[in-house]
Amino acid sequence: MRRLASALVFASILLGMKTVHAACVGRPTDAAGFASYDYADAAEVKSFAGTKVRVHYATTGQPAPTLTSTRADGVPDTVAFAADTGDGALSKYEAMGYNAVPSDAACASNGGDGLIDIYLVHFTAADGSTHAECDAGKCSSFALVESTFKGKGYANAEEGFKTVVTHELFHAVQNTYKPADAPFWAEGTAQWAMKKVHPELQDFERQMPAFFADPTRSLDAPPGGVTSGFLYGSSVWPLFLSLRQGDDFIRTVFEGEVDGADPLTSIDKALKAKSTSLADEYPLFAAWNVGTGKLKSSGGYPDAAKYPGQATMSLKDGASDITSGLGYFAYKGTLTAEQGITLETDASRNAGVVVPIVDDVLELDQAKKLPANANGSVLVVVSGITTKKSDAKFTIHVGDPIVETPAPGKDAGTPPVTSTPAPTAPAPDDGGCQASGGPTSSSALSAGVVALGLLFRRRRRS
């Protein structure tokens, strides 16, 4: 859903996150309307059918779109544009291998046929929402979309329709796999899909600042508020995954959610099928995010310079902090000689990478997992790697060089595995701000591993 305004709509969505909507919930064209949206003050309500969608609109009153038409059939240009946009988006999603959105013909209130319905309405502060109608595990959907986009921050109505219709219809696609998915994944992937269909649109970038400004917040714990920019800015996570693993990877995650798995569990399973994991990838994702804005980078996001960038702290021996969930911290510094960088922490909760900075460019394709040796200017990122929200303390140690496992040729951006010890079993997590169980010192264990001559082979990505 896009930035919702109605408290009734929000309540409906919250309910939908716990139980699947009953089939045939009613529409704005019904006498009773839908969640405060109706055409009661319209002299006439018309509709225009495309090949996959039907757009409903009022000819008078507050919900009416701009009615100017250059068409022989008299259909308003913006209405026809909305229909063409919807047809194009659904065709693109099907071409990408996603499920087709099922017909709603079985519902008495179905817009007149089995096409996917888009209702043009007036939002006070929002610009769109999508609603699933599910029966026996099969979900169709309909969408509410702003009718004029006046005062909504878009250059014109066409930009608004391309942005919102394309975003909302990916929610309809999502509903064929798992209705009411985790908001960060639902909104993030809808933004990602919108950008895949219309790469020229800038809404993807406009929504990033709130996410980039809050790196210590866990990805799956957005701040309160139905219009949270953090949710939309989290679109960089599916972007990262698609750049690392291919566009089809996102669909694979949705397919893994069909039986009820949460998105992060499905992501981890899909990554492990490619010989990596959430614990391997998330610290690198954090490093990619730091390598944006004014900090030049290579091997990361193609449009990194357009993204907001993130603040860093000074790297020093003994730097310490606490993660919660998938939050992360970034440190920059300069080493005057080769030194070993190790991480003292519960290895089941936190992990880190070190990335060289060469000629003021962050070389993300040279990232190495901690512990590792480094020299010169570097970025060190420490990230949570689980969804546990109790405190997970870490301390960075910068000291004498360590013995590393030689890393064979690697894929771009893949951190080579150094002589990292197997983690000890974590103590039970009591959820307190100082969870029981002391940290595991990766530096001390690493020395033990070297003494035993145990060298771990680098995990290769497929």
List the model feature ranges, each with a label.
Residues M17-A22:
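Sec/Tat signal peptide C-region and signal peptidase I cleavage site
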Residues C134-A136, E159, T163, K178-R244, ...:
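Acidic/His/Gly-enriched intrinsically disordered linker/tail segments
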Residues A7-G16, V449-G453:
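Bacterial N-terminal signal peptides
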Residues T51-A182, T189, P199-D203:
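Juxtacatalytic substrate-recognition/specificity segment
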Residues D259-A425:
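Beta/coil-rich, acidic/histidine-enriched accessory regions frequently appended to metallopeptidases
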Residues M1-L4, R458-S462:
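Positively charged n-region of N-terminal signal peptides that target proteins for export
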Residues S442-R460:
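A cross-kingdom C-terminal cell-surface attachment/processing module
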Residues P421-S443:
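Extracellular Ser/Thr-rich, low-complexity/disordered mucin-like segments
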